């Protein structure tokens, strides 16, 4: 399956159902009156973390996700049915961004609210009072939340395998786990992160084979920053370095890899790390190993020839890797953010655009919410709309801008002549 770790989508939660204007008129019923029911809630959109997924490919073709609308209210005070919620599976490690701000980090196999459905509108039964026993007032359902989101996947792995291209990372992953990565004798065989579950005794951990890094990866060279971000999720790092092949310099390779990690995120160097010195069966190995130990005496090194490793060697490697995940190692810092707490501050409740031909266009989130919520289907609703608009100062502002009788005013889809 194609690996996709970044997509942009639009989510539109369901609209709430409209409340209705209705009166009870039945023979032999002496207590009639308003009985218009409320609209149902619009359906919300949830993302659900799924450990069985490892790509955002399903979103690559589905750019828009729509929630189900709530049903309108009915007579006899009946509330409309709620719109069905939508639950969409996403890979663990998916981050959700709104206008470049992280709003949700999906790290657990549970549901996360992404877009909330709109509240259902009230029917005229709710507007009865001692002064108005037969109100012709109702509300439309609110629109569901509508967001343009960027989804970014950072694989959830305990240990990341890093190294230069063709160093043996894929071979190692195939030996210690059930993963079957592509293995070949040329550079950049691995073009996307490969995950494998490593079992050791009664425990297990997840290892990620990350595409080979070259000098300048942090600034975009090679696979570059596209895959460096996946290392941020790891709790430990294993360097796989070729110590035996001709024209290889393990010291230079190790320094370059650490430099790229540091440039990308300095915190990566705080993670527990070991080096697997690969190709110990080749002539240059001992010479390179001795030089490396002199340069980095504190670095833990495991000698191996991965291509011909015996089972006991593989078990030792697994034990050493598992040891990196001890209690003293740094814990991954993860922040879960509740999207329902996001608020948008309006600079102004409305914006007026005027033209020389006596045309005024009104826009703005607050005025849009008012015009959307109050249906102009009765005299009482029109009066209610007029009172709310007057309260926010729209009429006064139009007068200041020189509006004249007969001028046309448009508020989204609603138009009227000024009188």
UniProtKB/Swiss-Prot annotation:
Alphabetized Gene3D superfamilies for the sequence: GTP-binding protein OBG, C-terminal domain (3.30.300.350), GTP1/OBG domain (2.70.210.12), P-loop containing nucleotide triphosphate hydrolases (3.40.50.300)
Residue ranges of every copy of the OCT domain listed in the record: 342-419
A GO term from the CC aspect: cytoplasm
Residues annotated as binding GTP: 163-170, 188-192, 209-212, 278-281, 315-317
Pfam families noted in UniProt: DUF1967, GTP1_OBG, MMR_HSR1
GO biological process: ribosome biogenesis
Every Obg domain range: 1-156
Positions contributing to Mg(2+) binding: 170, 190
Recorded superkingdom: Bacteria
SUPFAM superfamilies hit by this protein: Obg GTP-binding protein C-terminal domain (SSF102741), Obg GTP-binding protein N-terminal domain (SSF82051), P-loop containing nucleoside triphosphate hydrolases (SSF52540)
Protein's UniProt keywords contain Cytoplasm: yes
Required cofactor names: Mg(2+)
Localization terms from the record: Cytoplasm
Keyword Nucleotide-binding: yes
EC assignment: 3.6.5.-
Enzyme class: hydrolase
InterPro entries noted in UniProt: G_OBG, GTP-bd, GTP-bd_Obg/CgtA, GTP-bd_prot_GTP1/OBG_C_sf, GTP1-OBG_CS, GTP1_OBG_dom, GTP1_OBG_dom_sf, OBG_GTPase
Subunit structure and binding partners: Monomer.
Protein name: GTPase Obg
Organism of provenance: Mesomycoplasma hyopneumoniae (strain J / ATCC 25934 / NCTC 10110)
């Amino acid at each position: 399956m194609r690996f996709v770790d970044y997509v942009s989508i639009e989510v539109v939660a369901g609209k709430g159902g409209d409340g209705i204007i209705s009166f009870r008129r039945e023979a032999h019923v002496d207590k009639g009156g308003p009985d218009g029911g409320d609209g149902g809630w619009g359906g919300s959109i949830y993302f659900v973390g799924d450990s069985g997924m490892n790509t955002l490919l399903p979103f690559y073709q589905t750019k828009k996700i729509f929630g189900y609308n709530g049903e309108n209210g009915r007579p006899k005070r009946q509330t409309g049915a709620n719109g069905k919620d939508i639950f969409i599976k996403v890979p663990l490690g998916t981050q959700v961004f709104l206008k470049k701000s992280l709003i949700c980090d999906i790290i657990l196999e549970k549901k996360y609210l992404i877009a909330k459905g709109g509240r259902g509108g009230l029917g005229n039964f709710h507007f009865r009072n001692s002064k108005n026993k037969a109100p012709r007032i109702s509300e439309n359902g609110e629109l569901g939340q509508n967001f343009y989101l960027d989804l970014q996947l950072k694989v959830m792995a305990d240990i990341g395998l890093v190294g230069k291209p063709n160093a043996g990372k894929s071979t190692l992953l195939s030996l210690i786990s059930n993963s079957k990565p592509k293995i070949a004798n040329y550079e950049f065989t691995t073009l996307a992160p490969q995950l494998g579950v490593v079992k050791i005794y009664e425990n297990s951990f997840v290892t990620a084979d990350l595409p080979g890094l070259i000098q300048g990866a942090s600034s975009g060279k090679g696979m570059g920053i596209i895959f460096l971000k996946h290392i941020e999720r790891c709790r430990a790092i294993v360097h796989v370095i070729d110590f035996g092949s001709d024209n290889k310099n393990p010291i230079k390779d190790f320094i370059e890899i650490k430099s790229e990690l540091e440039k990308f995120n300095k915190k990566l160097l705080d993670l527990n790390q070991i080096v697997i010195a690969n190709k110990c069966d080749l002539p240059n190995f001992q010479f390179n190993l001795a030089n490396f130990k002199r340069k980095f005496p504190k670095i833990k090194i495991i000698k191996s020839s991965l291509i011909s490793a015996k089972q006991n060697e593989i078990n030792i490697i697994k034990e050493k890797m598992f040891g990196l995940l001890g209690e003293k190692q740094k814990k991954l810092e993860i922040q879960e953010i509740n999207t329902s707490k996001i608020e948008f501050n309006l600079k102004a409740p409305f914006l007026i655009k005027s033209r020389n031909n006596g045309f005024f266009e009104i826009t703005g989130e607050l005025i849009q919410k008012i015009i959307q919520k109050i249906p102009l289907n009765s005299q009482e609703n029109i009066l209610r709309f007029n009172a709310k608009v007057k309260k926010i100062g729209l009429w006064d502002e139009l007068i200041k801008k020189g509006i004249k009788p007969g001028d046309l005013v448009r508020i989204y889809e609603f138009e009227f002549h000024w009188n």
